[in-house]
Design a protein with these regions (language model features):
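Terminal amphipathic alpha-helical/low-complexity segments used for targeting or macromolecular assembly
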Residues: 1-42, 100-104, 117, 124
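Glycine-centered flexibility motif
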Residues: 20-21, 47, 65, 83
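Flexible, glycine/small-residue-enriched loop-and-beta-strand segment within the central core
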Residues: 29, 35-36, 57-64, 69-136
C-alpha cells in the first residue's frame, strides 16, 4: 500500500503539481499545498510546514526539515539532508558528486567523477538564488 501511495504521489507531482504556479503568487491554485502533500510521500524524511516551489526536482533519498523550502527550479541530488528553517532561492543545484581533480597533469575531463557523497545543509541557512553546492 505504501508503494502505491509513493507511485501515486510521484505521478501527481510530475504530471500536475510541478507545473502549478509558485506558492507566493496571488492565484496559485493550491500548487504549494499539492507539492508539499506529494513531497511527504516522495521524500525520505519530511518535516512540518514545508514549501516546495514550482519545477523543483529532488531525488528519492532527500530529507527536508521543518519550516524549510525547496526553491523554484531547484535540483536536489539523492542523499541530501536539508535542516530546519532553510530558505532556498530560485535555480539552486545541490550535487552529490564532482569531477576528480587529483592529478594536475591530467585534464579534469579525463579524470572521471568522484564517488557519490551525501550533502548536509544545517539548520537556519539561507541559500541564495542560482547557488550550486557540491559535496566536500
Amino acid at each position: 500500500m505504501l508503494k502505491l501511495r509513493h507511485i501515486a504521489a510521484v505521478l501527481v507531482y510530475n504530471l500536475i503539481a510541478v507545473h502549478l504556479p509558485n506558492s507566493h503568487q496571488r492565484f496559485n491554485f493550491g500548487g504549494g499545498r499539492l507539492r508539499a502533500l506529494c513531497a511527504r510521500e516522495m521524500l525520505a524524511c519530511c518535516g512540518q510546514d514545508i514549501n516546495i516551489e514550482r519545477n523543483a526536482r529532488f531525488g528519492r533519498n532527500v530529507e527536508l526539515g521543518d519550516h524549510s523550502g525547496i526553491g523554484v527550479n531547484a535540483s536536489i541530488a539523492d542523499g541530501t539532508r536539508i535542516g530546519r528553517d532553510v530558505m532556498m532561492g530560485p535555480d539552486c543545484v545541490i550535487l552529490n558528486r564532482n569531477h576528480r581533480i587529483d592529478d594536475v597533469t591530467i585534464p579534469m575531463r579525463l579524470q572521471g567523477y568522484s564517488d557519490i557523497q551525501p550533502v548536509t545543509i544545517e539548520n537556519d541557512v539561507w541559500i541564495g538564488g542560482r547557488v550550486t553546492i557540491f559535496p566536500v
